[in-house]
C-alpha cells in the first residue's frame, strides 16, 4: 500500500526484488498475485498513462544521451523544453548546475565527444544529469533507485540535503544500499527473496534487532 505523501525506502541485498517492485508499481508488468494500492485504489484500475504521470523515476541503468544539457534534462517533460528557469532549478537540486555553468554553452552545450565542441562527463556527472531529468518533471512521487551510487561522499551528502527540500510536498520511494541514507524515511521496507520481511521506521527496525538492524550495524562498523 502506497500513500502519495509518504517517504518510503526499500532495502535488501542485491537480487532481493527491490527494483522489481518499482517495475510492478509502474506497470511494466502486473503481479501474478496480490494487489498494489495507490491511494487505496488497485493500480490496475488506473490507465498506464495516468498512473505513470504520477511518478518520476530514475533507475540504476539510466541512459546517457548525446544531446544538449537542455535536451537531456527536459526529456522527462518535453513540453517544458523552453523553460530555462525550471531546467536550472533541476540542475541545482541534483548538484549539476556547478559544472554545467562552466561549460561555454551552458545548458545548450552538447554532451559526449560525438560533437566537435561536446563535453565528456564523468560517471558522477552523468548521474547528476539523470537526477536533474527526474527532478525536472512535475510529479506526485519521485522514485530513486540508487541515486548516489556514482557520487563521492561530499556530493552524496549534499544531494540528500536537497532531497529534503524536494520531498516537502511530494512522496518518494528510495532504494539505497547505504542505510544511513534511509534513516529519515517514514517507512523502511526490508525485502528478501521477493518478500517483505520487515517494515517500520529506522528506530522500530533497530529495536527489532533482525535483518535491518544487522545490515545497519555491519555498515556502521566500517566508519568506527
Predicted regions and their residues:
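ABC-type nucleotide-binding domain
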Residues: 1-224
Amino acid at each position: 500500500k502506497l500513500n502519495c505523501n509518504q517517504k518510503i525506502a526499500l532495502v535488501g541485498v542485491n537480487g532481493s526484488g527491490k527494483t522489481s517492485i518499482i517495475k510492478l508499481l509502474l506497470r511494466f508488468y502486473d503481479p501474478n498475485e496480490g494487489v498494489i494500492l495507490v491511494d487505496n485504489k488497485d493500480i490496475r484500475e488506473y490507465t498506464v498513462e495516468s498512473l505513470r504521470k504520477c511518478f518520476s523515476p530514475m533507475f540504476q541503468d539510466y541512459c546517457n544521451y548525446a544531446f544538449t544539457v537542455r535536451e537531456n534534462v527536459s526529456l522527462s517533460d518535453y513540453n517544458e523544453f523552453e523553460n530555462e528557469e525550471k531546467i536550472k532549478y533541476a540542475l541545482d537540486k541534483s548538484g549539476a548546475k556547478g559544472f554545467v555553468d562552466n561549460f561555454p554553452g551552458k545548458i545548450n552545450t552538447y554532451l559526449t565527444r560525438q560533437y566537435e565542441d561536446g563535453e565528456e562527463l564523468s560517471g558522477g556527472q552523468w548521474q547528476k544529469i539523470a537526477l536533474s531529468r527526474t527532478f525536472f518533471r512535475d510529479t506526485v512521487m519521485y522514485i530513486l533507485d540508487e541515486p548516489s551510487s556514482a557520487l563521492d561522499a561530499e556530493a552524496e551528502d549534499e544531494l540528500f540535503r536537497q532531497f529534503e527540500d524536494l520531498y516537502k510536498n511530494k512522496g518518494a520511494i528510495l532504494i539505497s544500499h547505504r542505510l544511513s541514507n534511509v534513516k529519515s524515511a517514514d517507512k523502511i521496507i526490508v525485502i528478501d527473496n521477493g518478500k517483505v520481511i520487515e517494515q517500520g521506521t529506522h528506530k522500530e527496525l533497530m529495536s527489532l534487532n533482525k535483518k535491518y538492524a544487522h545490515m545497519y550495524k555491519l555498515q556502521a562498523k566500517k566508519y568506527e
